[in-house]
């Protein structure tokens, strides 16, 4: 049931609002139905449409430039500066818009390690946005509500549109972080991922700057012997899918911290998974998690409420959010210890990288700072086919600091712990076909269980990665060498060189070398 406590929101500038405070998942589900803002799928999940925006809008993400951020944030096309005065005026407009409305307030927190707990209060215009916050943030006990004090405030108003000429935004929608006032202000977009990624970006600044902790855009799980594995990768590369392993306990699927005390903790209390082409056979854990309490976004259903996950009429970026306990085998407390294996997941649009290769510490640091992958259809506005990109730290869109800052921290962690680092291509081979999920799982299982420790390896030309020549459970051993999937071997060599050159060009264009250590530079391709 909802909490009986009355919550005053006047202190935020919201006047005469009807406040629905700390509603349960069932109540928010019913509110969404009653207001005709969603429909119930046959699975019991609520299905909603996020409106005009079905993905993040990176060009409309801003950080207030002030005394805390001006000399620390890596300003540019990713971290776009916003004037403090403009923020204050826009905030006043948003809270005036929410005044006299029925609004929803949820209190939760991020960072599962108690030492790093950060309280989040989320104020939303819509009930399903509040259900998203309930699903995605860690849940607090009712006994904590009376003494709850937020460290960050999220204000989410999809129905409010900015006036770019007056408000300083690019267009009507915006997502702005203010590190002095600790407010994430979101307007003009109903895409729920802006709530999640706003707080993720905030932690990606605060944890390294103030808490000496490495934030990571990754999933993580734990084996039966307590061995932690980390999976880095951009949206659509397989983080959520590959970390949902029936033989391992899930710590989390997207955002984690790696502490000086050698813990790896989940930031979140839920999962936000892509569901395009989802089947119970391919991804049984995720499929089973879609039940009452979950939110399906922008999917197509028949008149009986059965979802057709193959349909992308609205967007390629169909999604589900659900609380982590919808997954059967989760790690108690969402905390693990130093990882034994790290996997960099990349979608190689060139089709030249092998399905798995082992990296030296230097290569790992270089690959991490480079963050090569392809933007997969639907995850951002306007992306309909895979496009080559370099997203530093496998999550540049959410990283306020210079990539070298994060790269330095990861390199130190790798050296301290001796962790194995693997590059996994979940994208194309030479036939422009994706490696099957079954084969990718077999490769990762082999790495996790030590079955790749004593096999023969060969070097990938130019890059120098170690490529295993055999792997138990893979349907066709020949695919382990990416060259074998190309009919034209000369074209393979040319494309491999072209990709290597693009790595070097990216490093030069972004001036990464200026902040990178000699170890990182030693991991570059040898042209």
Predicted regions and their residues:
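Charged, amphipathic alpha-helical linker segments immediately N-terminal to NTP-binding catalytic cores
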Residues: 151, 158-208
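Hydrophobic positions on the alpha1 helix immediately C-terminal to the Walker A/P-loop
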Residues: 242
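N-terminal accessory targeting/assembly segments
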Residues: 1-147
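Generic C-terminus detector
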Residues: 484-527
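Conserved lysine of the Walker
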Residues: 239
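Glycine-rich, often acidic-flanked micro-motifs
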Residues: 3-42, 52, 217-234, 245-246, ...
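A short glycine-rich, hydrophobically flanked beta-strand micro-motif that places a catalytic Asp/Glu
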Residues: 106, 213-220
């Amino acid at each position: 049931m909802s909490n009986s406590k009355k919550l005053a929101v006047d202190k935020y500038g919201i006047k005469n609002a009807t406040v629905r405070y700390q509603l349960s998942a069932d109540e928010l589900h019913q509110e969404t139905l009653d207001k005709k803002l969603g429909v119930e799928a046959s699975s019991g999940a609520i299905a909603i449409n996020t409106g005009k925006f079905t993905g993040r809008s990176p060009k409309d993400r801003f950080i207030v430039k002030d005394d805390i951020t001006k000399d620390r944030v890596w300003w540019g096309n990713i971290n776009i500066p916003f004037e403090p005065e403009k923020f204050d005026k826009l905030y006043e407009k948003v809270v005036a818009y929410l005044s006299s409305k029925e609004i929803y307030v949820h209190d939760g927190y991020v960072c599962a390690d108690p030492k790093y707990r950060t309280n989040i209060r989320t104020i939303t215009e819509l009930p399903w946005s509040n259900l998203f916050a309930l699903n995605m943030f860690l849940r607090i006990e009712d006994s904590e509500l009376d003494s709850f004090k937020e460290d960050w405030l999220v204000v989410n108003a999809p129905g409010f549109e900015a006036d770019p000429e007056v408000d300083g935004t690019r267009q009507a929608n915006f997502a702005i972080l203010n590190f002095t006032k600790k407010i994430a202000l979101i307007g003009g977009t109903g895409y729920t991922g802006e709530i999640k990624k706003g707080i993720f970006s905030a932690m990606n600044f605060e944890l390294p700057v103030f808490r000496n902790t490495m934030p990571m855009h990754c999933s993580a799980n734990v084996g039966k012997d307590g061995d932690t594995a980390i999976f880095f990768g951009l949206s659509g590369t397989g983080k959520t899918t590959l970390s949902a392993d029936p033989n391992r306990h899930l710590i989390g699927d997207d955002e984690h911290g790696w502490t000086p005390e050698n813990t790896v903790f989940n930031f979140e209390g839920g999962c936000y998974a892509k569901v395009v082409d989802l089947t119970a056979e391919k991804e049984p854990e995720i499929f089973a998690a879609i039940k009452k309490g979950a939110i399906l976004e922008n999917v197509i259903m028949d008149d009986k409420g059965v979802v057709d996950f193959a349909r992308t009429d609205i967007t390629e970026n169909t999604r589900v959010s659900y609380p982590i306990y919808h997954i059967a085998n989760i790690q108690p407390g969402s905390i693990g210890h130093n990882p034994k294996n790290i996997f960099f997941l990349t979608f190689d649009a060139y089709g030249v990288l092998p399905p798995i290769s082992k990296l030296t510490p230097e290569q790992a640091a270089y690959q991490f700072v480079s963050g090569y992958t392809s933007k997969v259809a639907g995850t951002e506005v306007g992306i309909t086919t895979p496009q080559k990109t370099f997203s530093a730290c496998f999550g540049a869109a959410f990283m306020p600091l210079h990539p070298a800052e994060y790269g330095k921290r990861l390199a130190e962690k790798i050296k301290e712990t001796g962790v194995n680092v693997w590059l996994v291509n979940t994208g194309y081979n030479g036939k422009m076909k994706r490696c099957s999920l079954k084969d990718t799982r077999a490769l990762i299982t082999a790495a996790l269980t030590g079955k790749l420790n004593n096999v023969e390896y060969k070097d990938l030309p130019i890059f120098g990665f170690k490529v295993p020549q055999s792997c138990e459970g893979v349907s066709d051993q020949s695919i382990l060498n990416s060259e074998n999937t190309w009919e034209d071997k000369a074209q393979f060599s040319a494309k491999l060189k072209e990709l290597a050159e693009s790595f070097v060009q990216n490093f030069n264009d972004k001036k990464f070398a200026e902040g990178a250590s000699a170890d990182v530079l030693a991991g570059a391709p040898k042209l």
